Regions:
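Metal-associated gating/positioning segment near the N- to mid-region
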Residues: 60, 67-127
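Residue-level marker for buried hydrophobic side chains located in beta-strands
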Residues: 3, 72-74, 244, 317
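Divalent metal-coordination and catalytic microenvironments
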Residues: 7, 35, 40, 66, ...
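Short peripheral tails and domain-boundary helices/loops at the edges of structured domains
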Residues: 397-407
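Metal-coordinating catalytic core of metallo-dependent amide/deamination hydrolases
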Residues: 112-127, 133, 141-257
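Active-site-adjacent C-terminal substructures of enzyme catalytic domains
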Residues: 243-244, 253-368, 380-382, 386-387, ...
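N-terminal metal-binding scaffold of metallo-dependent hydrolase/deaminase domains
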Residues: 1-54, 385-387
Length: 407
């Protein structure tokens, strides 16, 4: 057992609703606080001096200077297992080329597939670990990672095995997702419906047998998979007992409806979601995940986060870190920028990258600082929590704790 502190402020994010809008006045802030940790779990939060007096023999982990402590963040949507780089896509986009033109000139998702197929497991493991460490340094200790750059049995399994192996090298929690339905691979001879059936018959059973992922994702879009075939695929994946998440409404609306109808845990992107569908989504238990990094990467509009919250939806915010649409990999910067464009309160943003994004991954043991929760913490050297988003990511995390231990 040990006591961590003192903190100028502890922002616990406790006792807040899972859904809907939040104001900063609703935030519980413990000033001059301490956190009591036992076996990786929070036992108590409260006034540091009082806790020290109550547990006089206890080991102390002293915090220097004025610092603010929050629950560590959860990035619930990334594609950080990939080979190569797509800087040329960026140049082509800025020269006015369309998505299709870029794909035709050798860029796009398919080019990342070719690089990822070429990479060995060891090479992929090294790069994914570097990206994981970079996320940890931002205060993110729970990271979802998708496959989807293999797109055949061998390479999809390779990606998921790499993610599984990465877990044995990091204290961060990694949540793998099978995104074999990212795109119909160019070397698959058959229709996209046949490819989706191939995933059901040939990939998912192996994913299950090796326990490589419990979640299945699909990119529903004109350039990827159409709504009806996607719905059938998702229902079959559900029958195989996978949890569902969807790349929905990125450029065209309609697919968030499918996500809700099949009971997806989350619908992610939503840049193009129409008002009617926002209402539908917001009334459901499907988490609406904004990916501001993709809006910034592509120069597209932001997810209507304000409308989603006002309609009572569960809003998470994630980085979408990938080599194509979202190469930045800085969730704090992206979430801060989303706040300015969508007029979000600090409380709404912090909820979106802590307990609400953890909920999107079915992890209800983290994301707030209260008794019984996982002692994953992030601290910032500042006297006021508002400064974290105000500086748009340039105020760096000072300490990161996982299970109560500094990493
Ligand atoms: O979430 N939209 C589809 N998939 C990714 C992009 C992946 C890529 O371009 O490599 C996304 O933005
Ligand atoms: Fe994505």
């Amino acid at each position: 057992m040990k006591l961590i502190g003192p903190f100028k402020q502890i922002v616990t994010l406790a006792n807040l609703p899972l859904r809907g809008k939040l104001s900063d006045e609703q935030l519980e802030i413990i000033t001059d606080g301490g956190i009591l940790v036992k076996d990786g779990t929070i036992l108590k939060t409260g006034n540091f001096t009082a806790l020290k007096a109550e547990f006089s023999q206890i080991k102390l982990e002293e915090i220097e200077g004025e610092q603010v402590c929050l629950p560590a963040f959860t990035d619930s949507h990334t594609h950080i297992c990939f080979g190569g780089n797509r800087a040329n896509d960026f140049a082509l986009r800025n020269a006015g080329k369309t998505y299709l033109e870029i794909a035709e000139s050798g860029g796009g998702i398919w080019s990342s597939v070719l690089h990822t197929r070429k990479a060995s497991e060891d090479e992929l493991l090294q790069t994914v670990l570097e990206r994981i460490n970079s996320l940890i340094s931002l205060g993110i200790t729970t990271i979802e990672i998708k496959s989807g750059y293999g797109l055949d049995v061998e390479n999809e399994l390779k990606m998921l095995r790499v993610i599984k192996k990465a877990q044995s090298f990091t204290k961060a929690t990694l949540i793998p997702t099978c995104l074999s339905a990212h795109l119909k691979p160019k070397d698959f001879t058959g229709s996209s419906e046949e490819y989706l059936q191939f995933i059901i018959d040939e990939i998912l059973p192996k994913v299950k047998a090796e326990n490589l992922a419990k979640r299945v994702d699909i990119f529903i879009e004109k350039s990827a998979f159409l709504p009806e075939e996607s719905r059938n695929f998702l229902l079959k994946a559900k029958e195989l007992d996978f949890e569902i998440t969807v790349h929905a409404d990125q450029f065209t609306s309609g697919s968030s409806r499918i996500a809700v109808e099949v009971g997806a845990k989350s619908a992610d992107h939503l840049e193009a979601t129409i008002d009617e569908d926002i209402e539908f989504l917001a009334k459901s238990n499907t988490v609406a995940t904004a990916l501001p990094g993709a809006s910034l990467g592509l120069g597209e509009k932001f997810t209507p986060a304000r409308k989603i919250l006002d309609a009572g939806g569960i809003l998470a915010i994630a980085s979408d870190w990938n080599p194509g649409s979202a190469p930045m990999g800085n969730l704090i910067t992206q979430a801060s920028i989303l706040a300015t464009f969508e007029k979000l309160s600090t409380a709404e943003v912090l909820a979106g990258i802590t307990f609400r994004s953890a909920f999107a991954l079915n992890l209800e043991d983290r994301g707030t600082l209260e008794n019984g929760k996982k002692a994953d913490l992030v601290t910032f050297k500042t006297d006021n929590f508002q400064n974290i988003l105000y500086y748009q990511g340039s105020l760096k995390a000072e300490h990161i704790f996982i299970d109560g231990e500094k990493v």
